[in-house]
Amino acid sequence: RVEELQNLYSLPDNIVFYMATPPEMYEVIPLGLQKCGLAYTSDGFRRIVVEKPFGTDIKSAKHLTRLLESIFDEHDIYRIDHYLGKETVQNILVLRFSNGIFEPLWNRNYIDHVEIVSSETLGIGNRGGYYESSGALRDMVQNHLLQLMAFIAMEPPVAFDPESIRDEIAKVFKSLHHYTPEEMQEQIVRGQYTAGTIAGESVQGYRDEKNVSGDSVRETYVAMKIELDNWRWAGTPFYIYTGKRLSEKKTEIIIHFKSTPQQLFVGQCSGSSCNQLIIRVQPNESIALRFGLKIPGSGFEVRQVSMDFLYSSLSDKKLPDAYERLLLDVMLGDSTLYSRADAQEASWNFIDPIIKNWVKRRKDGLAFYASGSDPEEIDRLMPHDKKCNCCNEMM
């Protein structure tokens, strides 16, 4: 049928296979393509797109990579992450590497800490079967949030081409500090939502969802303090938060710059969050810079103000859907925004020990939180002196 269509419309022999299927089909489909001869061509290209999850641990990720590479070349394997198709995420590279005012400050000397937040008001819906075998750590942290962190933490690439950029992303994952068992208890919070109220509506708890065990210990919330063992970021923590059934749906990155060494003015922010660069990924893709200014009138009282930019203000045209951009890149052969095998394996090397620790501990350390609120346990992750103390309202 494919050959008939190509001949009918005089199309080149270029085919993209997009595996938006259950993970258990990730081996069956490539082997089937190989068996029927569709995986090869002498006059065009064959590319395959793989949705997450790309494996469930380091062993399965390596196995899937070996299988795909036995049929396709690595540069024809596209591991898709729709977060990287969002305009704001792509603009992190431009913001950092085309503006001289930011890059000189983008290091441990001037940045106190970084927060990466992805929260949802929805529960798991009809995905109980999938979520019971996955959880927030595999579903969100191993791919989406670590990828966002890599864009923030990576070194400048030697050139703006796919391999140079993916080289730097892989280096970030390889520099992830691996937790000791003691650090896992101190620097990671896992939680599960219970019944509660969101936007005035009562919602059920995770264990009451369809296809979920009544005594499940699967996490629907993860908060982590992550450190990178490299020159640029040594001593600067990255805090990652993600969860379902929280009070607000948003994904954003907050860069907290260090405060001045001395507080000279009344009302001056005294925490380490006085100057923030906020990159809003969704909804309403935007960038905001927060800083202190004098309130009009006598004296030198300071208020925090915000300089905002909305991507929608650049054009009346609707921003392209993340998948639209990413699938176009596949057709063009541009793998910049796709994960490479070594980066995937490095991220699984970081995640695997955490999963094994949780399996061993079962419900020990699992925090329960009412839908619409965060687990109380997250307060121990971030020291009080790193929390924003900007008590004056934004102007």
Please report, for each region that a protein language model flagged, where it lies by residue.
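Secretory/organelle targeting and membrane-embedding segments
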Residues: 1-50, 54-395
